[in-house]
Amino acid sequence: MKHIGRIVSFPIGLVLIAVGIIIFVVVNRTIKDEFKKAAVVIPDNGAEEIVDPWVRFIGNEGDPNNVRTYTFMAYNLTNPIETMQGHLPKYQEVGPYSYNYIYERINANLYEDDEKLSFKLWKRYFPIVADGYRDPTKDTIYHFNLVYGAAVKQAGSEVALSVALTAAAMGKIITGLTDPSFKVKAGFAAAPTVTAGAFSNLLTAAGNDPATACGLWQTSTSSSTPLVPFSVPIIAGSPSDISQAQCQALFDPSNKFSLTDPTNVGVYLLNPAGSKAALLASPFGLTSVQADLIMKYQLALTSTFVPTTLVSRFAECSDPKTCTNNPLYFGLLQWAKNPSLLGQSVFAIPNSGVPAAPEFGIYTSSELSLTKAGSLFLNTSTINLITPTSIGTILVYGQKLKADPTSIPPALYAPFSSGEFDAIVKYTGYIMAAFVDGDIIKNQIFKDYQGGPIVKHTVHDFLFNSTDPLLKLMYPDTPSAWVSSPLDNIQDVKVANATLHTDEIYTGVGDIDLVSSPITFEGEEELNYNKKIKVSGSFAEQLPPSYLSKDPEAPVNVFTDEFARSLSFRKEVGGNFGGIPYYRYRINESNWEINPDYFQTIPYLLNLTSIKSGAPAYLSRPRLKGIDVGYYYKAGITDLINDDEDLDVFADYEPRSGKAIHGRYSLQVNTYIQGSDGTNSTLYNKYSAFRSDVVHPMFWGVNIIAATQEQIDILTKAYKVDSFRYAITVILIVVGGFLSLISGGLFVLDKIIDL
C-alpha cells in the first residue's frame, strides 16, 4: 500500500507543477492582452474607459481626464522703439497665465484593416479668469512678430519687401482701373460734366432756343446730335411723357434744376431719392413717373453716352468701341494718358480707396501708348510693374542711369524710349514712397503696433487670437489666412474640419510596437529641414506595451508635434507613483547640440524656420536654460541666468502598459536675429534696424499630466493579479515539486530497502 501512495503522490505533484505553469502562462497572456487593449487606438477596442486611449488620450470634452491645465509665461518688450532703432532689447517675463486645455482627434477614419488611422488634431484653450489668476485677456505686451519676420526672410530684406509691396500695389492699381466696374465708376464720375455739357451744347446748337433744343432731344432719331436723343431707346419710356413746357424748363439754365448744370446732374445720380423729391418739388410740374423717366435716362447715359464721349478724344480710340468695350484699354486711358480719361485723378472721386493719385500720366506729366502701357502689366514683359524682379530692375537701372546716362543700353529697357523709361523710374519711386512707405507701411501695417516687426497685443490675443495687417493685404478674401498667433485655438468644430491638417498614425492593430506612432506630420511623411527627415518615433503618451519592461535602458524616440522632430529620451531614474513602478525619461542633451541637418547652429536653440513657412521660430527650454549666458545679456533677462527651477520635459512610463502615468511637457518659443554680434541685421534694413545675433524670447508653456486615481487602481490591480499569479505559481510548483521529488525519492528508497 505504501508503494501505491507514493506512486499516486508523484503524478499529483506533476499536475500541480503543470497547473502552476498554466496559470503563469494564461495570466501573463491575459495581462499582456489587457495592456494591448488599453493601448490600441481604435474605437470600441474593449478596454475599460478610464484607460481606453480612444477616450483618455484621444479626447472627450466631457471626460475630466482630458481637461488639463496649461500654464504660460510671456515676455514683454519694454523698449520697442529703441529695439527697432538698433538697440538691444529689454524683455520682462510676465505671468503666469493658466488655461484649460482640451484636445481631441476629429474626422477619424480607420483603414488598411484598422492598422492605420487618419484624423485632424483639434486643440482648444480656455483662459482661467478667476480670483488668484492673472487675466491674459487684459494684460498687454509688446512682442516680436513672426509673420513680419517670415515676410522679410522670404523677401530677402525689408528693401526687397518694399519692392514686393510696390509690385502688389501696382497690380492693385491696374486691377482697379481695368475692372469692368471702373467703367461704371468713370461714367458716374464724368457724367455731371459730360452730360451737362452735352445738354448745353445741344442748346447752343439749337440757337439757345429751349423749344428747338427740346425738339431735337425728344423727337430726333439721329445720333449725330450732341446728345443721345430721347427717342433713341436706351431706356423704356416715351418722349411724349414729358410735355414741351416741362422740357423747356429743364433746358433753361436759369432754373435751379436745369439739366445744363453739372451740379444738378451730379445730384440726380448720387442721390436718386433726394433728387426725385427735389424734382417733384420744383416748378417744372413733373409727375413721379416723369421724374423717374428723367433719372433713368441720366443713369443710362453713364454707361453709354458718357464712356463713348470720354474715349472719343483719344486718337487710339478712333472707333470708340475699341476702347469702351475693352476694360484694359479703358483703364489704361485713365492711367497712361495726360490729360487722363476723366481729366482728373481717381483720387478726386469720393471713397476712391487710394492714398494719392495712382495715374502714371498725371504724376509724370507724360504719357504712353496703350500698347506700351499694357506691356507694363504683363508679367511676361522684361520691363513690367507687377513683378518684384522687374520692379527691382527698374530701380537699379534708374540709379545707374542717374549716375551715368550711358550705363544701361537702351535695348535692355526696350520698347520704351529713354524719356519714357525715365518717367517709369520716376513713377515707380513715387508709388513706393506714396503708396507703400507712406500708406501701406505707415498707415496700415506699422500703425499703433498692429503689425510690423514689433506688435502689441493682450497676452491671450498674442498666443491664440491675433491677425496681421500684412496677411490681410496678401489674402484680402481669405480671413482664415490672416491669423498670426503662434498657437491654434479654433473653437468651432466646422472651422476645425475645414482648416486643420489631416494626419495619420498607426493604431497598434497588426503591430503593437507601432501603436500611436506618426505616419505624417501636417500631412507630410517627411520633414523638410536641411535634408529630408522621415517622420518617425513613438507617441509621447503611449509607448509600445512591455517595451520598457523588456529593457528599461533601451533608447526611447518620441515624435512631438510642437518640436516638429523626433526627440531621443534617456532613462534617468526609477520610482513609484501611487503604488505603480515607473521609469523616468528625459530628453537627451544631444538633441540640443549643433546639428546641420536641422539648421541648428546654436546649442539649446532649435530652428523651425523651414517647417513654419519661413517664420523665424526657434524653440528652447523654458527661460532659455542651457543657452550661452551672453544671449541673456543681449535680451535683457539677466535675472533669469541663475534660475534653477526644473521645467524640463520628462515622462514617467509604467513599463508594462507603456503609458505615461506622469509627466511634464514644456517648451519656449523665441525668435533669433541672425548675423554677426555687434552689427545690425542686413534683413531689417529699411523700416527698422535690429541688432544681429540676438535671441528674442516670446513665451513658454508647461503642461503637467498625471494618471488619475482610477487609472492607478486599474494598473495596481494588474500588478496585484500578477503578484497573486506569481505567488500561486510558486506555491503550486514548489508543492508539486516537493510531492513529486519526495514521492519519487521514497519510492526509490523503498525499492532499495526491499532489495
UniProtKB/Swiss-Prot annotation:
Similarity remark: Belongs to the CD36 family.
Assigned keywords, A-Z: Glycoprotein, Lysosome, Membrane, Transmembrane, Transmembrane helix
Glycosylation sites: 28, 76, 379, 465, 497, 588, 607, 680
Record GO terms (molecular function): scavenger receptor activity
Species, as recorded: Dictyostelium discoideum (Social amoeba)
Stretches of the chain found on the membrane's Cytoplasmic side: 1-6, 749-755
GO CC, any one term: vesicle membrane
Any GO BP: phagocytosis, engulfment
Function field: May act as a lysosomal receptor. May be involved in macropinocytosis and fluid phase exocytosis.
Stretches of the chain found on the membrane's Lumenal side: 28-727
Chief location category: membrane
Modification after translation, per record: Heavily glycosylated.
Transmembrane feature ranges: 7-27, 728-748
Pfam families: CD36
Subcellular location: Lysosome membrane
Name of the featured protein: Lysosome membrane protein 2-B
Motif mapping: Di-leucine motif: 752-753
Membrane topology: Multi-pass membrane protein
